[in-house]
């Protein structure tokens, strides 16, 4: 009898095509807008998107792409593109046929792009030739796995030469007959292939499965419904996290699952254009690294626009208190989130619990500035070097370790790094944090960025947070610099606000920090030994301040 029952049972697989299927069934007429700089506004419904996805999926199958299996990559499709409607097509079409979507980081140096593509070995390369055609020949010369190039353009361009491989215009994919049924795929099949940003060495690759990404989509869509974000289908969303960066934090999937009535993709990152589109489309919900929020607030056109309806989640780096208050002065709602490339990425969001909702504004800000509390289906601890939980006192620093369904199983071709990350059944993030009695955490630093002075730790993020509140400070980074006596000492590198260039002094900053010493918030020995003023700070390919460059640049700053 049990055999008969089993024969009728359908083992439902959590695959990304199911997210699209639900969105189309529940919200067929919701709108996706693609509005690139200098281009015209293009609008499609969720139903129209599904038709595009099915046509592209069928066309890709005709290129003889092979599906993966449980924990085993199939054919890889590399994409080099900005935040466009075409990229959204591919976020669904490529994984839904069992292939792996490899999101090439557009901000890497050409050598790093070639390196990651050499490791990934994609069979099909889909590329925006308006911006990236100069990379085509060096990539094809070095990455011999590529047998077809699909080229995209907003300007009607065609490739400028014969590249020796099959060249297909993206529009030809859309002319294909739509795929009637997506193939059955094991939910453990890798859906995406990502690389870390490589701030401590060459970028490292790993994959995320359909199951992990579907559960991540459900969890994040649920978590953002909490106050103060209160995300709902009435929110018009803009995808500002680059789509080449950790799935754009899952927004191409979660915003559709969440039924947002309008989802806007602004193309390449032109901040004057983006501000205008936020205004004209009535955007109320977005997210990005602190640099993105900083650009929205400081662009010369920014004062022309009302940002008071915009709810914004900051992740990828710590939210400085000064940036939070600058955004609040414009009426914005801003909170923190946290995650990694290896974690798909979201692990925590600093939402408010019921007991927080009547707190004074300053107390709420303390919560928004924390890294947050784990979202559904994430288990999180903060541990010492012996993997023991640190006290939940908001003071003791340890490392964040996690479990969830959406983690890298391994780093491709790097068993040593895999062993270092997975220990005792927990994924070690490399992030130092404190743990509060209520379960919220706050990142103190990357373990590699903690300043080790005289055998004690100085968290650079805490100093940056305090310095950022000075009225003359635009951006700040604090790094550890070699010191003959103490091992390392902190040095602050500051970009002054307009009007403060040449006026702001080292003593101004040190005296400003003394007030926090006198209040007992930091010890005196944390005050930086040196303050350096610059016009700009170096950024990584994902828009974070590049402390590796700063440590190297200022390694002799305290030499006698």
Predicted regions and their residues:
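Conserved pre-ATP/AMP-binding loop-to-beta segment of ANL
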Residues: 28-31, 167-168, 175-195, 202, ...
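Conserved AMP-binding/adenylate-forming
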Residues: 40-43, 59-111, 239-240, 457, ...
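Conserved AMP-binding A3 loop
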Residues: 43-47, 191-218
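Structural core segment of the AMP-binding/adenylate-forming
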Residues: 96-172, 498-500
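AMP-binding/adenylate-forming catalytic core of the ANL superfamily
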Residues: 108, 114-115, 125-127, 286, ...
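AMP-binding/adenylate-forming catalytic domain of the ANL superfamily
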Residues: 152, 518-544
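Gly/Ser/Thr-rich phosphate-binding loop
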Residues: 168-171, 257, 280-288, 297-366, ...
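Conserved AMP-binding/adenylation subdomain of ANL enzymes
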Residues: 214-236, 244-284, 299
């Amino acid at each position: 009898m049990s055999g008969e029952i089993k024969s009728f049972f359908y083992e439902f697989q959590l695959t990304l095509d199911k997210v699209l299927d639900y969105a189309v069934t529940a919200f067929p007429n919701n709108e996706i807008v693609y509005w690139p700089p200098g281009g015209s506004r293009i609008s499609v419904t969720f139903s129209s998107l599904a038709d595009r996805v099915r046509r592209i999926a069928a066309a890709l199958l005709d290129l003889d792409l092979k599906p993966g299996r449980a924990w085993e990559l199939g054919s890889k499709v590399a994409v080099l593109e900005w935040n466009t409607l075409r990229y959204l097509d591919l976020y669904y079409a490529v994984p839904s046929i069992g292939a792996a979507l490899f999101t090439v980081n557009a901000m890497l140096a050409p050598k790093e792009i070639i390196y990651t593509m050499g490791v990934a070995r994609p069979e099909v390369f889909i590329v925006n030739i308006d911006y990236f055609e100069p990379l085509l020949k060096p990539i094809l010369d070095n990455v011999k796995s590529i047998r077809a190039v699909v080229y995209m353009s907003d300007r009607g361009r065609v490739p400028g030469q014969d590249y020796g491989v099959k060249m297909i215009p993206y529009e030809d994919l859309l002319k294909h007959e739509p795929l009637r049924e997506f193939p059955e795929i094991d939910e453990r099949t890798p859906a995406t292939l990502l690389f870390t940003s490589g701030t401590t060495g060459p970028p490292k690759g790993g994959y995320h499965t359909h199951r992990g990404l579907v559960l991540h989509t459900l969890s994040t869509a649920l978590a953002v419904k909490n106050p103060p974000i209160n995300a709902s289908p009435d929110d018009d969303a803009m995808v500002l996290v680059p789509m080449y960066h950790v799935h754009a934090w899952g927004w191409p999937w979660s915003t559709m699952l969440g039924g947002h009535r309008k989802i806007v993709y602004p193309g390449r990152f032109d901040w004057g254009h983006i501000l205008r589109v936020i205004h004209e489309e009535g955007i109320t919900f977005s997210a990005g690294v602190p640099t993105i929020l900083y650009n929205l607030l400081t662009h010369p056109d920014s004062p022309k626009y009302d940002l008071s309806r915009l709810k914004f989640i900051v992740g990828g780096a710590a939210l400085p208190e000064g940036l939070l208050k600058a955004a609040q002065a414009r009426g914005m709602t801003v909170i923190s989130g946290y995650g990694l490339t290896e974690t798909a990425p979201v692990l925590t969001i600093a939402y408010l619990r019921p007991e927080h909702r009547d707190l004074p504004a300053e107390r709420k800000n303390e919560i928004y500035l924390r890294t947050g509390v784990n979202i559904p289906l994430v288990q999180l601890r903060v541990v010492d070097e012996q993997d023991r939980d640190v006290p939940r006192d908001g003071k003791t620093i340890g490392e964040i370790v996690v479990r969830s369904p959406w983690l890298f199983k391994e780093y491709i071709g790097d068993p040593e790094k895999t062993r270092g990350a997975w220990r005792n059944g927990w994924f070690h993030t490399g992030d130092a944090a404190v743990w509060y009695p209520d379960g919220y955490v706050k990142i103190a630093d990357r373990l590699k960025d903690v300043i080790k002075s005289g055998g004690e730790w100085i968290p650079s993020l805490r100093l940056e947070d305090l310095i950022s509140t000075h009225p003359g400070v635009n951006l700040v980074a604090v790094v550890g610099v070699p010191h003959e006596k103490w091992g390392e000492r902190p040095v602050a590198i500051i970009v002054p606000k307009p009007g403060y260039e040449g006026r702001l002094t080292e003593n101004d900053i040190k005296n400003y920090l003394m007030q926090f010493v006198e209040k007992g918030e930091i010890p005196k020995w944390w005050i930086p030994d040196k303050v350096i003023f610059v016009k700009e700070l170096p950024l990584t390919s994902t828009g974070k301040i590049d402390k590796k460059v700063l440590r190297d640049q200022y390694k002799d700053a305290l030499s006698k």
